[in-house]
Amino acid sequence: MIEDCAALKPAFFPSVPRLYNRIYGKLTAGIDAKPGAVRWLINKGLSAKMAALNRDGRVTHGCYDKLFSKFRNLLGGKVKLMTTGSAPIDKKVLDFLKCCFSVPIIEGYGLTESATGGGTTDIKDPVTGHVGGPSEAVKIRLKDLPEMEYLSTDKPYPRGEICLSGPCIFKGYYKREDKTAEAFD
């Protein structure tokens, strides 16, 4: 897949955490295999870029972006935005990829039944590890699950089943009225 990206030069790179984790694994293994001085320089650059990301959300760095262009070129060198969703992803992986590819990564929450439109992080939000607020096309609420002792009134962190409603929510399962009735309350 990475070889295809280098040839196709996409501007937008949506993916799932599983693929991002594989990319992370290959990149970190590649860095670890570099000779000492090269590995030191890459790690110094990563540290500087991580500091800038944590300080003010910048994913670029004037001194180190030339070095990291080799990583960008793995995806064709033209990617301006990456997105992820469908499963949780480790903050460490997201921050590493933001710094290596010098692009923001938007993390989202949604379901097939919501056309993925649950919530997304803001492109300018430097904080990783959350999926942002609700999108404009959806309402989100927590439904109490007393049998599991999950209550929306739990402090400090409310818990419950996440329920979505809005125009982006599907109308039902094709020829599966039983499953449709089960999905809506």
Language-model features, listed with the residues they occupy:
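A short beta-to-alpha transition loop/helix N-cap that caps and shapes the active-site region
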Residues: 2, 22-23, 116-117
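Conserved P-loop NTPase motor core
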Residues: 1-3, 106
